[in-house]
Amino acid sequence: TGEKPFTCKECSKSFSSNSHLSRHQKIHSGVKSFTCTECDKKFLTRSSLLLHQKVHTGEKPFICTECGKGFSAKSQLHRHHVIHTGDRPFTCAECGKTFSYKQSLVTHRAAHTREKPFICTECGKSFSHKNNLQTHLKSH
């Protein structure tokens, strides 16, 4: 019926079941209890680990019907499709620049606001771009 009676106390996001809420709450705890046996990289959820493991197997079962490029996850294929449609629905209110992805707009906005929304859970250092945080995380 669309009811979502289970609410996260950290961010107020609601869920239809307690198990979905529990899975979500791992995001806030930062505890990465799932480890890849190939490279020792750690993940918050089992599903994230399983998706990552396709990097090692090279498995790419989701194929773009436009260009034939393969992806390891359905979500990656959907994200890829904008390359072919040219759709850029996200517009910067500050300068009018348009983006295909919401996250690209969020990252771009940091240039105007000097925001640093990407925060290291290990030491608290913040970054304006996700890739800078990812590079930093390798130093821990």
From Swiss-Prot:
GO terms for cellular component: nucleus. It is found in: Nucleus. Keywords: DNA-binding, Metal-binding, Nucleus, Repeat, Transcription, Transcription regulation, Zinc, Zinc-finger. Its main location: nucleus. One of its GO terms (molecular function) is DNA-binding transcription factor activity. SMART domains: ZnF_C2H2. The keyword DNA-binding applies. One of its GO terms (biological process) is regulation of transcription by RNA polymerase II. A zinc finger (C2H2-type) spans 6-28, 34-56, 62-84, 90-112, 118-140. InterPro entries: Ikaros_C2H2-ZF, Znf_C2H2_sf, Znf_C2H2_type. Belongs to the krueppel C2H2-type zinc-finger protein family. May be involved in transcriptional regulation. PANTHER family: ZINC FINGER PROTEIN, ZINC FINGER PROTEIN 613. This is Oocyte zinc finger protein XlCOF15. It comes from Xenopus laevis.
